[in-house]
């Protein structure tokens, strides 16, 4: 598993600007200002990031688990292009330690593992640091970085459950589902996971998700994609799993 340099805004965390990953700017300056158009009752419980006309709202633990009027998700051009993003490590949800919005387009979530039990033995809680970095720009950048402090190598799985419902922001606010249109079966090809919606007027909306490194397997459960990496974590050696989400 490859490691990646920690994304950072240049000049200190308090300054807006491009977030740099492995020496490359993920995106440039923020665009329009203003709070994302999500239900007011949900806004206070979410981390909201914005760049231009795109915005993302995630839970304090970094997950997206969209429900009626929850407002969670990745939005572009008034359409929700990502309605679910759930992380588990070793089949368990990470234990949240802290989360913070570093700038209007950049958030960091720190967590640790729950107790993991498997054929190789038990990994005690608070053995693995799990750091999520969320950056919104022309695309969504989502990194899961793991670092084990167990004295021996830990072998475990990392899973992301992903889905896109393509609801528009007015339906999210008012609770409902658009009539007409068709959600096609998700697919995985050439290292990319794709979700496609064809509106009643024939317009196509697509969510394309890049995964690096290549996952061990990708399974489907209806409109959900289950992405699984089998990872080895030597003591103190970081492992980075990177997800990019593009909305068309």
Can you say where each PLM-predicted feature lies in the sequence?
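Terminal accessory carbohydrate-recognition/targeting modules of carbohydrate-active enzymes
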Residues: 2-248
């Amino acid at each position: 598993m490859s490691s990646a340099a920690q994304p950072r805004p240049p000049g200190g965390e308090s300054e807006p600007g491009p977030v740099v990953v492995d020496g490359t700017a993920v995106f440039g300056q923020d665009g329009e200002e203003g709070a994302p158009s999500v239900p007011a009752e949900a806004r206070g419980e979410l981390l909201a990031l914005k760049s231009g006309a795109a915005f993302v709202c995630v839970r304090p633990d970094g997950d997206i688990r969209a429900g009626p009027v929850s407002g969670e998700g990745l939005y572009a051009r008034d359409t929700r292009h990502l309605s679910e993003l759930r992380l588990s490590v070793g089949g368990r949800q990470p234990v949240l330690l802290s989360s913070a919005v570093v700038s209007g387009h950049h958030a960091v979530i720190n967590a640790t593992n729950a107790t993991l039990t498997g054929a190789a033995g038990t990994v005690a809680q608070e053995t693995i640091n799990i750091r999520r970095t969320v950056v919104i720009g022309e695309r969504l950048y989502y990194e899961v970085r793991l670092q084990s402090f167990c004295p021996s190598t830990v072998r475990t799985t990392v899973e992301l459950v992903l889905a896109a419902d393509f609801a528009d922001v007015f339906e999210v606010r008012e609770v409902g589902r658009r009539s007409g249109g068709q959600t096609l079966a998700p697919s995985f090809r050439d290292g990319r996971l794709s979700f496609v919606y064809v509106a009643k007027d024939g317009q196509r909306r697509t969510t394309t998700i890049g995964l690096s490194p290549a996952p061990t397997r990708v399974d489907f459960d209806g409109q959900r994609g289950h992405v699984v990496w089998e990872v080895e974590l030597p003591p103190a050696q970081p492992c980075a799993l990177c997800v990019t989400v593009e909305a068309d």
